[in-house]
Amino acid sequence: MLKKILLTTFVSLLVSFNVQAAKYIFKKDLWTNCNILSDKDQSTLKNIDYQEEKKVKGWDRRKATANGWSENFFTAFIFFSTFENGQIITIRVNTEFKNKLEAKKQAMKYGKIYGQLPNFLRSNLNTITIHKGKRSWGGGNNDILIHTQAKDYSNKKVGDCVEEIMIHESAHVSLDWSWGGSLKKKPWMEAAKADGVFISRYAKRYKKREDVAETINWWIAVRCKPNSISKSDVKKIIEGIPNRLKYLDQQNFDTHPLKCNY
């Protein structure tokens, strides 16, 4: 009996030590759980209207080179998407999608997902840019960049991760101070220092630019969708990053269409 108690205590201490030594909670980053939002969640998207086909300037990761990456011109189908709060977002779909009908399918798909996000994550966006390709998404410059064939954004074991990626990139646009977002650098950094742990390995690796975007998925999980993740993960998050959670709580976010408690 004593051996069992000692073994249990040792395992608990070892787990705690590993988290502290690693300094992050989730090794698989946001792919730890891709059920925070799903296609069953309400979307505030009201309608999408086609406007025109024209040449625009924007970002496309396929154009990146070893020497850098800059905006380029491409021809796009232009749609205006309207949401319940009156927000109108321009969705730009690359004409590589053959025709207006195919382009509208893409605009509808990602416009609906964007409409599932809480209002506070939709406060600083002007455009959504959609290309084909397997490159990673991006968020910043008042834009969300989508590559529809991004290889790691669907995980059969944990579900489709597209909604969680949309949350992540929208956090860059609407929350990151580096992109004119609503959060302030100093109190965030103070909260992070007090926590002493990052939410994910990715957040730790790129702490200056990814901590906010990685954290917000899990704030939404514990405050708005606690049944979407395991009780053990809820406990890890609440105990691991209490100061960041508190700072986010203090923002009094408009979380519609999600119902949140904090």
Residue ranges and their predicted role:
Residues E190-Y262:
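Metalloprotease/metallohydrolase-associated module, dominated by Zn2+-dependent proteases
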Residues M1-K4:
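Positively charged n-region of N-terminal signal peptides that target proteins for export
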Residues T44-L145:
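Auxiliary, metal-adjacent structural segments of Zn-dependent hydrolase domains
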Residues E163-S178, A213:
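Active-site recognition of the HExxH zinc-binding catalytic motif
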Residues F17-A21:
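Sec/Tat signal peptide C-region and signal peptidase I cleavage site
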Residues T8-L14:
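Bacterial N-terminal signal peptides
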Residues D160, S178-I199:
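Post-HEXXH active-site segment of zinc metalloproteases
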Residues T148-M166:
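Short pre-active-site segment immediately N-terminal to the catalytic Zn-binding motif
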